[in-house]
Amino acid sequence: MTTPKGVLDFIAGVTWDDLPQEVRQQSKLCLLDLIGVGAGGAGTKLSRIIRDYSALDMSGALPMMFDGRGASAAGVALAGGMTIDALDGHDGFNPAKGHAGCGLLPALYGLAQDLNHVSGQEFLLCLTLGYELACRTALAQHASVAEYHTSGAWVAVAVAGVAARLMRLDGNQTAHAMGIAEYHGPRSQMMRCIDHPTMLKDGSGWGAMCGVSAARLAAAGFTGAPALTLGTDHW
C-alpha cells in the first residue's frame, strides 16, 4: 500500500519526550475525565446491556472497565466505549464534530492488558497519539461527504493506528490496519440518532471495536484500502 511515510513514522516513532508539557498534562486530565464520565455511564441500562453482550458474545479473559467480567480486547473496547458514551459528558473537539477519547481509552485498556508490555507512560502517549489521529481523521472524513456522521467512524481509524503501534506492526501493516478500520467503521448518519434518540449514541464503542479488530486482522495479513487520513492533505 502506498502511504505517506511521514505519517507512519510519526505513529511508530513519537515519544513522550516529544510532547510539550501542557500536552502531557492535558492527556492526564482527559484520562481522568473519561474515567469519571465512564463511572457515571456504568449505571445506565445502555451500559449494562452492552457489557452483558460483550461478556456473552465477545468472551475472553480481559476484565471490562467498570465490570470485571472477562471479554476479548475488542469486547473490552466495545463495552467501555459505549459506557463512556452513555452520558455524553466526555471531551469533544469542535472541528471534529465529536468525541475522540471515549473509544480510545477502553481500546487501550483492553490491549494493554492483553499485550502485557505497556508502561503507564506508553499508555498516556498512545492516548495522546490517538487524539491526534482521531481529530485529523475526523476532518478528513467530514471533508469527503456532506452528511454529519458519527465519531465512531474516525475513532476506529485512530484506534487501529495506536493498536498497531502497541502491537509493534510494521508500516505496511499499520497502513492496512487503518484502512480496514475506516472501511469497517460505523460511518453512520449522526442526525438520525439526534432526531430519534436511542442507545446508538455516537458509535464510539463500535468504532473502538472495529479499530482493535482491524489491527488484529492486519497483523494476520488481511489487507485494506488506504485510509483518507493517510493522505498528505491532512498532515
PLM regions with names:
Residues 1-235:
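N-terminal core-entry segment
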